[in-house]
Amino acid sequence: MSAASRRWVAADGAHLDVRGLKPPEPMVAILSMIDGGAEKTAFTVHLERDPVFLYPELVERGWIATPVDADPGEVRLRLERAR
């Protein structure tokens, strides 16, 4: 995978793949997507590891993360604006 995040839209909504990026680039890419308003309500992120430092940042911005089924060696989270 290249050293850049990938975005696409599937039947279940928008996706952001940050696998292959070195910390803190995955968190920066995810927060940029939220802060920039690219996704207003929800999207799925694909990561290599559990983003423990991301969770407090999401709470601060009014978002929640829910784990979803993923391939072995992948962490997949559905990020949604808290209601």
Protein language model annotation of sequence segments:
Residues W8-A10, G37, E57-V59, D69-D71:
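A generic structural signal for short, solvent-exposed coil/turn residues
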Residues F43-I64, D69:
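Short, structured protein-protein interaction patches enriched in aromatics and acidic/basic residues
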Residues G62-R83:
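C-terminal edge-of-domain segments
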